[in-house]
Design a protein with these regions (language model features):
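Short hydrophobic membrane-inserting alpha-helices and related fusion/pore-forming segments
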Residues: 119-128
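Alpha-helical transmembrane segments
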Residues: 61, 92, 96-103, 127-134
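Membrane-helix interface segments in multi-pass membrane proteins
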Residues: 2, 61-98
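Residue-level signature of transmembrane alpha-helical entry/exit and packing/kink sites
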Residues: 49, 53, 87-94, 119, ...
Length: 153
């Protein structure tokens, strides 16, 4: 199967369809798109979309842990009790973010022309997570367009 230039979104362009990856996304664009595509498992996500959200999630984890340390007095105590404000915020973020995070991971796999079923590799201890990390770091593959929904009905 060959791909014409009209079927591909070039790097640096903003896609017309919501299924197309947003290359060179800013942190604000990645965050907005993450929540707008909350449970969308079709389509693709660029590396920048994926890694900006990974950075935001890391920042939330650091922030909620910091709140726990400040309110509990020490890091060790903050990690042994699950009753602090930081814990509640962490649980709220985790519950709100689980579905869009999995959906984003599936779309990122699609952008590398891999089936979303590879996401289950993350359930394999150590090796599975490392392999997924390599997949998420992989460059976009134009053949991943096959995971976009057909336009026009």
């Amino acid at each position: 199967m060959s791909y014409t230039s009209s079927q591909e979104v070039r790097l640096g362009q903003r896609p017309d369809a919501s299924d197309a990856p947003l290359y060179n996304a800013t942190i604000a664009e990645a965050f907005t798109r993450y929540w707008k595509r909350y449970a969308t498992f079709s389509g693709r996500a660029s590396r920048s979309e994926y890694w900006w959200m990974a950075l935001i999630s890391l920042a939330v984890a650091i922030g909620t842990t910091s709140i726990d340390v400040v309110t509990n007095g020490s890091f060790a105590e903050a990690r042994t009790t699950a009753t602090g404000v930081g814990d509640l915020l962490s649980y709220a973020w985790g519950l709100a973010a689980i579905v869009p995070t999995v959906a984003l991971g599936v779309r990122r796999l699609h952008d590398t022309n891999r089936s979303g079923n590879w996401i289950f590799l993350g359930l394999v201890p150590f090796i599975g997570v490392i392999v997924l990390l390599i997949f998420y770091l992989a460059p976009s593959n134009p053949a991943g367009v096959r995971f976009d929904r057909a336009s026009g009905g």
